[in-house]
Amino acid sequence: MKLSLSCIVAISTAATSSLAFVPSNTRTSIASRTTTSCVTSNVKKTSTLIQMSDTVEEIETAPPGINTELLGRPSRPGRPLKVAIAGGGVGGLSTALCMLKKGFDVTVYEKTAAFARFGGPIQFASNALSVLKEIDEVLFDRIMEKFTFTGTRVCGIKDGLRADGSFRMTNDSLDYLWNPEAPADWFVKFPLKACADLFGLPYTGVIDRPDLQAILIDECKKIKPDFIQNGNAVNGYVSKGKGQGVTVNLEDGSTAEADVLVGSDGIWSAVRAQMYGEEQRKTSADGKKRQGCNYSGYTVFAGETTLKTDDYYETGYKVYIGPQRYFVTSDVGGGRIQWYAFFAFPPGTKKAPSGWGGSERNDQADPEENLVEYIKSLHQGWSSEVMTVLDSTPPESVEQRDLFDRSPELLRSWADGNVVCIGDAVHPMMPNLGQGGCQAIEDAYVLSETLELCKSTENLEGALQDFYKKRIVRVSIVQLLSRLASDLIINAFDTPWSPHDDLGKSWKSYLTFFWKPVLQYAIFPAQFAYLYSYHPTGSMGGLPAELEAKWQEQHVKDSEAAFDRVEEDGQSVAAPSFFKTAEQPATIMSAKKN
């Protein structure tokens, strides 16, 4: 389409700088009004492209297939903010969707060659669900269709040695102190539902990571079909100075230009490595330090099984505590139970294969070793509940990962010029609170809101520093709480004292016993109330209860069908399913019941 010279002059005058941009809620720009007066109504789409382009030449070569919904949104003088995102994980995709919905021009650079179904379930607490709903109603509704609620059921801590009938630590009564027939109960229950109800938020639960990523990718493609470039990771950047943007260096040797680079490329981030002058993936001789991370002191084994336990529908997740280790189980939907076994082992104590992070894949140390039997041997004398879960798990599906984390970056900003890091790149977390993905989603939302307030690229550096200041206190608290949970369970807790047996007689056992009321009535309520206190939607009224009721019926149907299938065909588990990468296709295995 050709425009008259007077129209071009008018448009150029309206867009005083090709680098200027305003929030997406600005209604009608000068350029829009001027263009409308110069062209007929049948070129409305082109007039919007003019406002979003740097030059008239760009108008005639605008990429086909751009979503008309985006073009119909309130206009920006000049052009949209151009954002490059390193990494197409949960944090990167959430950031992309947030920014695309605000009219930014976003490209995600992802190392994997193509999207594939990989990775295990991910927990979303009430705070993250509030953010997801605020980002997009359709996104939230689609996630709820794939969601499994755990926070509406009993969740908490059990004694790993007494949790099958002899446990005397009831929540609401002191009968266990003198009555050996007092019913077995939980050591501590988590107030997940009560804290969610306090703020009127959806309840904590899980969703399979592949389902989540597929939904995020689909919602992004509705706005910009070619928003993601697969098979081309970010491996560095060159800052061009204030207001001049950043050159993004890609793995294939090419470069890309952007106003902002977001490093969402995980714990071994290449963007972070350059920002902080770290040698990427460099590991110390003793294995305890790696690219600014410290070995947490814990290794974790993971597995999944389809199993109908006696309390399957009544419990969400359980943490079994014992000397120098703990064992976690969670309902993850469709009759499946996901489990994690944490041990205080030195780094490099590798037994099982792992594909976590894309660089730590290795074969099983001893292919002939039965990993389930190995883990059972480390839980001698533990509850039959733990043994039943392990016995039903195909040994081939077991995986392992050494856990690394970082101290909060209180003295170093997450931003360098027009480059910023989010998620695990700057605040990796121990998995105990299930807040790793949640905090990455909070990052995505806050960063997008902060950048939307900018009116010029000259202000971007300050905006990124503002983002860091907005997030550092909350993220640091959550990081410390996550680490403290592991340290307490492993180093301070032991089998609780009971007057009815000799299982817990050490000083740690007495300490654990006296921790019970403090944890139940003070620490855990305060902890979860703080986590859920960030909820941009505000209260959702009766919606959380409606969602849970709708899910409950379907959950029973799906689970019973899975139990019937296992009864007939045995366990069928995709492995690796937790820590694998897209380059490593899943292998389906079956373990027929005897």
Residue ranges with predicted function:
Residues L100-G120:
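Glycine-rich FAD pyrophosphate-binding loop
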Residues D164-T204, D208-D211, D252-A256, K289-N294, ...:
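Conserved FAD/dinucleotide-binding core of flavoprotein oxidoreductases
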Residues V56-A84, I143-E145, C155-L177, E181, ...:
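C-terminal helical "tail/cap" subdomain of flavin- and related membrane-associated enzymes
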Residues D208-D211, D218, W268-T315:
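Central beta-strand plus flanking loop segment that forms part of the substrate or channel wall
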Residues L5-S12, F21-R27, R33, C38-V83, ...:
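Extreme N-terminal leader/targeting segments of oxidoreductases
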Residues I85-G88, G92-K101, V262-G263, W268, ...:
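Conserved mid-domain beta->alpha element of the FAD-binding
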Residues F118-E219, I489:
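Active-site-adjacent segment of FAD-dependent monooxygenases/related oxidoreductases
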Residues N230-V246:
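A conserved short coil-to-beta-strand element within the FAD-binding core of flavoproteins
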